[in-house]
């Protein structure tokens, strides 16, 4: 996803205005199906293996999300989309395919970020946040 696509998607979702302040956000990422493919993709980007339990959970998920937080959600999403300034390991390994949502009412805290990740995770959805898989 490019910065132009990310901007357009925020606008399509009707959350562009709300993204210009602090809060949490979720990005949809592309994760291969199959534990070996997940591990190979991770190792191609990150010079350390992914825990097997994480690889198994990611491979089995229908949807994989990355949840983050920022003092300015829009700027952080643009940084992730650009890939030159900020590139979280999970996003470096598995590319961003869509914006799942933004929550400007969430506090810009680690607790709010983890709570958002927990609320989005389910039997079919894996959520990566700050090095943890929910």
Q: Where do the protein language model's features map onto the residues?
A:
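A cross-kingdom feature marking charged/low-complexity
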Residues: 104-122
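Basic nucleic-acid-binding interfaces
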Residues: 85, 89-108
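GIY-YIG nuclease catalytic motif and its immediate N-terminal context
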Residues: 1-79, 110-116
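Coupling/hinge elements of helicase-like and P-loop NTPase modules
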Residues: 121-134
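Conserved short hydrophobic interaction patches
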Residues: 80-84, 119
């Amino acid at each position: 996803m490019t910065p132009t696509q990310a901007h357009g998607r925020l606008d399509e979702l009707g959350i562009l205005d709300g993204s210009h302040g602090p809060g949490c956000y979720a990005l949809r990422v592309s994760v291969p199906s199959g534990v070996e493919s997940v591990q190979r993709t991770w190792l191609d980007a990150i010079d350390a293996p992914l825990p097997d339990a994480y690889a198994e959970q990611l491979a089995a998920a229908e949807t994989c999300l990355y949840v983050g937080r920022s003092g300015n959600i829009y700027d952080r999403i643009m940084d992730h989309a650009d890939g030159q300034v900020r590139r979280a390991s999970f996003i470096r390994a598995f590319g961003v395919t869509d914006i799942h949502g933004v929550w400007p009412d969430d506090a810009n805290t680690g607790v709010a970020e983890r709570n958002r990740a927990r609320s989005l995770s389910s039997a079919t959805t894996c959520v990566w946040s700050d090095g943890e898989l929910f």
